[in-house]
Amino acid sequence: MASGKIWTVRDRYGNDIYLSAERWRHVIDPDNHPEMMPYLDAVAATVQQGRRRQDVYDPNSYQYYHPFLDLPDKNSHVVVCVRFRWSIAADGSMNEEKFVTTAYFQVF
């Protein structure tokens, strides 16, 4: 994991999206969503198989959501927030990043 990426998966729309170790630490931090710790595979599955909706306030952010039967506290879905970011490198080429920012449970 030299790049700091835990995994990279392709969503149903053809986007390669990654989860970094830093973002996963953020998700499972005791002040955020520590209940997500055993659900790393569900986070990946949500990005791969889930539906998504664009954030109302940030058109470069999306929420992916997918139902699971075994979630705690009557939750029905895993929600994964993903950011799309583009920049231009010094050589003029386009850099593209699509990465998980956070994840949590929700009742739909």
Q: Model segments located where?
A:
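Ribonuclease/tRNase effector modules and their secretory precursors
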Residues: M1-F108
